[in-house]
């Protein structure tokens, strides 16, 4: 079963990873593994944002079409 991802949880985890890496107290392999996890999370977050952006764009364009049709009827 695939894990369901949550934007806020992923963002919080990414912030934790960045904080840990910035401290610089890890061995190379640990740093690499955290960096890799951070990149994977970052890609997921970007994908989620693009999906939401697309949905918002669709909603806005649908709303504009409705408003335009209403204005046509009032003419």
From Swiss-Prot:
Q: Which residues form a coiled coil?
A: none
Reactions catalysed, semicolon-separated, are: Exonucleolytic cleavage in either 5'- to 3'- or 3'- to 5'-direction to yield nucleoside 5'-phosphates
Give UniProt keywords alphabetically. Answer: Cytoplasm, Exonuclease, Hydrolase, Nuclease
Give the Pfam families listed for this entry: Exonuc_VII_S
Q: Name one GO molecular function term.
A: exodeoxyribonuclease VII activity
The EC number on file is 3.1.11.6
Subcellular location(s) per record: Cytoplasm
Single biological process term from Gene Ontology:
DNA catabolic process
Highest taxon, organism lineage:
Bacteria
Q: What are its GO cellular component terms? A: cytosol; exodeoxyribonuclease VII complex
Q: What Gene3D superfamilies does its record include? A: Exonuclease VII, small subunit (1.10.287.1040)
Query: InterPro entries per the record?
Result: Exonuc_VII_S (IPR003761), Exonuc_VII_ssu_sf (IPR037004)
Q: Does the keyword Plastid apply?
A: no
Known HAMAP family for this protein? Answer: Exonuc_7_S (MF_00337)
Functional note: Bidirectionally degrades single-stranded DNA into large acid-insoluble oligonucleotides, which are then degraded further into small acid-soluble oligonucleotides.
Q: What is this protein called?
A: Exodeoxyribonuclease 7 small subunit
Species: Caldanaerobacter subterraneus subsp. tengcongensis (strain DSM 15242 / JCM 11007 / NBRC 100824 / MB4) (Thermoanaerobacter tengcongensis)
